[in-house]
Amino acid sequence: MKRFFIVILFILLVCIFNVKSEEQLGEIEISKNSFSIDTNAINAEINYVIDNSITKPKLIVTLLSGDVNSIEDITSISKDKSTLTFGDFSSLSLGNKQSNNNNRIVLMIATITGSLLFIRFNIGFNKSTTLIILIIGTIFLIGSSHSITLSEVSIRIDIKVPSTFKFEKLDLKLGSGSSNIIGLSSNSINIDSCLNLKDHKINLSDTTITSALNICSTKNIDIKNLKQSSNSLINLKTNSNITLNFGNGYSGLLDIYSNSLKIDEACDIKVDGLNTTGSCNEGTSSKLVINANGVTITGTTPTTTPTTTPTTTPTTTPTTTPTTTPTTTPTTTPTTTPTTTPTTTPTTTPTTTPTTTPTITPTTTPTTTPTTTPTDSCPTTSTWRPTMASSSSPSSPSFSSVTPILDFNFDKSNLGFRSRYKFNEKSISDGPNGIANSFSINFNETYSPDSNWLISKIPSPALRANVNYVFSFNFKLGQALSSDNTISSVTISFYSPIDLPDPNVLEYFDQPTASPLFTKTITTGSFSSSTTFQANSISIKPTTDIGLSLIAIQIIRTKQNSIPINLYFSEMKLSIPSKSIIDPTTFLTKDSELINIPKASASFDSQDPSTCPYLATDLVHWHDKSIWSSGIVPLPNASSNIILPAGKRVLISPCSISQTDIYKKITIPPTSELIFSDVNMTMHVQDIYVQGKFTMGTKECRYNAYINLIFHGTKTTSDTIATNFGSKGIAVASGGFISVQGKQYHNTWSKLSTTAWSGDSTIYIQDSVNWEVGQQVLITTSVYKDELYNQNEVLTIAAISGKKIQFTSALKYYHYGGQEYQAEVGLLSRRIVFQGDQSSSDPQQFGGHVLVSGEGQFSGLSLVRFGQKNIKGRYPLHYHLANNVQKSYISDCSVIDSYYRCYTIHGTNGVTLTRNVAFNAIGHCYYLEDGVEVDNTISYNLGAFVHTIGTPAAGYNQYGQDFLQSSDLTQPADSAAACYYITNAANSFIGNAASGGWSGFAFPNLPRPIGNHLSVSIVPSQFIAKVWEGNTAHSSGYYFEFGASIYVGGLLTYNDATGLLQYSSGRESRDTYLTGYNTSAAVWMRFNNTKVYLSNRGLSMWGERTEAVNLESHDSRRPASLFGEAWLSNAIVNGQSGNILSASVEYTRQGFQFYDTYVQTIISNIIFRNFIKYQNASSNEEDNRVIISMTHSSEFLPQGISVSKNITIQNTATSQFIGHNIPVNSTGSSRFFNFIDWDGSLTGKNVPTLIGSHEKFWQFDNTCSFNSDWNCYVCTKGTREIANVQFWVPGLISRDDAQNNDDSIGSISLFGDGITDRRSTRVIHTAGITGVSNSGWYLYLTDGTPTYMKIWLAQVIYNNYLFIAIPYPATTTFSVSSEYKYNSNYNFNFTQTSSASAVRSGDGKKYYFDGTHLFIKVINFRLNGTESFDRGGAKVYDVYWEFLIHITASNTIKPPVNGFFKGLTDTLPSSNL
């Protein structure tokens, strides 16, 4: 019995206390450069360790005390893998929990069973033993339950990184514990242990920062050997003591609040109570802010050059200012330190979805309840000024000599699952909890296919031939290995996107029909483990360069599954290896071969510091309570409207205001002015109303400080600023003035001077720039379909010198920089930033806005998360009904991640909009609103990545789609959003670039103005551009078959009855006049020096008058589509450039398509090159041909409407010169296709040449030969011209009842001139016969010849004729006459002559009937030889309205039946005529 109770006692101790020793819970890989750890709910000991045995950073979590079974019980990682939170998550890890409980239950059962056996054989059963058994069972049941008590849990977190690793941002939100951080390198570090006032001691040693260090702690802060850049910001707060030692010296400003202070003698300080301000070593850039009881600062004298990479624009903002300050910390928050200027752009390429979360984060979490009294330490004397910012740029470090390894990561978010059947949206899901970058493939149904595909949703990087790349992944089975889940092979392939199904759309898929660009299969991978992830890798070495492609991964199992199975993947990636950086030996010396693209002046704006507004002697300080009527400096709060004192010029300095709390509204009265100091500062605000003046720099005193205005407010349509001025922004009333002018960076954008490949970290541009380390740079796409395959990239400058830029990370994609065209490279960062607060802006796309109804001057300003989607008038930067301005401009600004437009000119004339950049905007970007805006200059701007609102306009024919104004589409033309939206062309457009958008430049047709100007009596679409010079557009036009990068089309109208706008996206022509009024001369809309590339149609205008002179088109489906009287001259049309991304069968290219009816088109002085045959073309029109026909219809028939002259064709097979299509179902437009090669340069005949279709009707003499490659007759033109007549037969053929019906009702044949064979073409119900003049045409109608017909001489040109023969029965008599509808002097009655020959040689007023045929010679007597469209030494003759020939026939012997003479023999007239 004694032995029994000893056993029981042991069991009790094990079950009750269940004590665990120190235990490693697991590892978590850190996959993001910006990472956040939140241990606020748990006691944590944090160590930062340099470990060069690893290549990637990771966390090791060790349990020191408490009851935790799995790392998954206490951790949760965000979906983007950037935030790790510690807490009680045991309810989310049911699998592990259940498994542990099961283990406990098994142990319990085993122990009870053992006890029963022990009792049975050693003691025997009785009442006492039964009770003991019950006690044992209860104890084990208690022990088998499992819950986590966080207060009892203590962990150690070891952050291990290789010595070369640098964080972009590291955030630590800490509870109790301690941190010992040694060797950390980061752009910014934010450590906050103040949130719950828990004690956490912080020690830092050998730490390097380049932007900001923010620490808040209730315990001591000990920092040794801190290395910081010359522009870093250091903010330390604690109830206890601070020891701070600098490893590279300290030069900069001080702002310290402390009970005691020991500081180096090299610092010049001023002590006012507990406040100490000043600077060390005359430094001004860095900023040191400390709140503490005791401070010791050593090493302030610089002794060495900082080793860190300097940055002037911190890429993050401090977030550690506690919402609850330590209990012993003074209530004054230092305010002379800005919270840092935020990154103005995404650190990664935006997705193709325009509503992605923008990338600028607010500097702090502001409150509307004031937490500070900012004015206590600010002098109020009139002469006092803070130390103003310097214009100096940080020195660039040396360039790295190698590129970093670049990994393309794949996971659930960017892969689509496809199979033959049995799959859905749940077939791919998140991977196991706690496993970074993992996903699961789920075969939830039995007998799922044994093969499936993972198809990438994002384009692959460009791959060079003969370079080794690695595709790798870790793999684990979800169930133990069996025949159900055995992997037989994994194949990695690269396909052209058009050869794969859309990975965003669920659809069944078996195998691609096309061959891959590259493929490789492995059959011997590590695919057997169900307990641990095993590494797999595949070496990839393409034999040719691979441009635009998608990765497709095929996974094949040995058989279909009989049970549900899961396959787990982690760390799937394609790696581009590191390589040495070797500077190219040659660079582009010009950006174009032919055209001239003007550039902005290379000079900087002249500066005169003596004029700086903060130097004025009549200023008063915001923080001077004596200027306020209440005698109190106004504090920020949720409801106040701070009205500046009337008649005062108020200077605002960092110490004047709270930089963390929100100012509800600031009003500047008409006689007042608000002037900002040129000092780094941040201000949170909702509304600013300017009736007087708002000044933040001037043209001659551009500010150098980092000034950050953050606008707050949830979505509303209320006017909280002022009536009609909306909410959340700055509004300048009529009569008001605003000037915001930051440091000038020039050029604001350039172009590549050599191609940049995926994996490159260094680029070379065409212009020297003064950009700075740490700034953000955009490189635009080099693909055709910008929105579908987003390859725009935003990177951070690591080093820079002149035209060479190196980034902190490698390029993901290929960016072309050949002679034909080059990707644009734009600077996004500015020192002055206006941004929408992310938390209130993102959810409903409701950012800030700036509206100016007075005069406004802006330069060096960045606007981020601005614009309010679908709210009219709420745009990022907007001149609003300012009429004629005299001194307003927007220069070298940037708009980034806009919710609605970029730069708007509305009811305002005389604005200069120049050298600006815009990126990632919803709706039209550069926007002329109502159609009355004229005399503005829009020059040297860049717009990129512009998104439509709603479904992009498409359509199945030339007329596109109709869109009606709605709450989801306030301006229906946003369905075709353009980089530049031009409702009135009467402005100057010089040197602008458009990348992406539905179109690059859109000229919608407005029959009258809209909006506020409905009553203005002009027709906006009748105006021509004042200047169009040197503009470029690319990567657009692809949503609509007839869309273009420069699109002059569409119709925007206002319905007076409904009060709604309507937009039709398709065909709409425009008449243009010299003054814009139809009482003046008709003029041509001219486009000079234009470049289009990667376009659907480069330039499209539906008519009526167009000239495009000096044009380059590269990699476009067609360079231009021009209607009406159109001239394209002096051009290079290049079917294929050196850009490997465009070398795809995604689309074919044609040099020019001649239209099919009623236009006049001349192309002259054109070089066509690189039209390479596409073997799988469905027709000649779809092949890569230089000239193609339009052959789709029998309703629209061509006349003589097309001429070419001085054509040069290079690197193109002769077979590709012309591509005439013969449809399977014949069409009239195909039969009558023709054009004149004016000088024979295109066909190579070198004499004027006539090209006609495949019909023998075009074989008019023995100079004609049929070219089987072209499907055309090619003839020496001689004295012949193209002629067109229309036979109008009542009830049979009518011009007014054109039909797309190609049924034959007869034929027309050549006769005379020695022709004995049939050279004919069919006649159909649609009126119109086109052929060669000065020839015999014989008309035969199958159902007989009518008693009456008209012949319209649409195109029988001056000094030309047609000799027409028509069969009639013998004894028929005739009345033949001519009629000119508009002048009876040309009306003649024909007389009968003696022979057919006499008719042909006669004056055109005679006829002859030989008993079988009526012969007439038709001449248009009205013509005088001036009826033509002439350009470039060539001409296209007019279609002339309405000269008619009437023929009336009667016969009493063989009378007609129902108006037709029947039974006539089809006999060709004599060949001798």
UniProtKB/Swiss-Prot annotation:
Q: Where in the cell is it found?
A: Membrane
Q: Which residues cross the membrane?
A: 105-125, 130-150
Please name the InterPro entries in this protein's record.
CEMIP_beta-hel_dom, G8_domain, G8_domain-comF-like
Identify the stretch(es) annotated as Disordered. Answer: 298-400
The Polar residues compositionally biased stretches are 376-389
Superkingdom of this protein's organism:
Eukaryota
List UniProt keywords, sorted A-Z. Answer: Glycoprotein, Membrane, Signal, Transmembrane, Transmembrane helix
Its membrane topology is listed as:
Multi-pass membrane protein
Which cellular component appears as one GO term in the record?
membrane
Instruction: Reply yes or no: does the keyword Transferase apply.
Output: no
Q: Which residues form the G8 domain?
A: 626-754
| A Pfam family matched in the record | CEMIP_beta-hel
Which residues are modified by glycosylation? N126, N203, N241, N275, N444, N637, N680, N1078, N1088, N1176, N1206, N1225, N1389, N1424
Q: Where is the signal peptide?
A: 1-21
Biased composition range(s): Low complexity: 298-375, 390-400
Q: Which family does it belong to?
A: Belongs to the comF family.
What's this protein's name?
Answer: G8 domain-containing protein DDB_G0286311
Q: Which organism is it from?
A: Dictyostelium discoideum
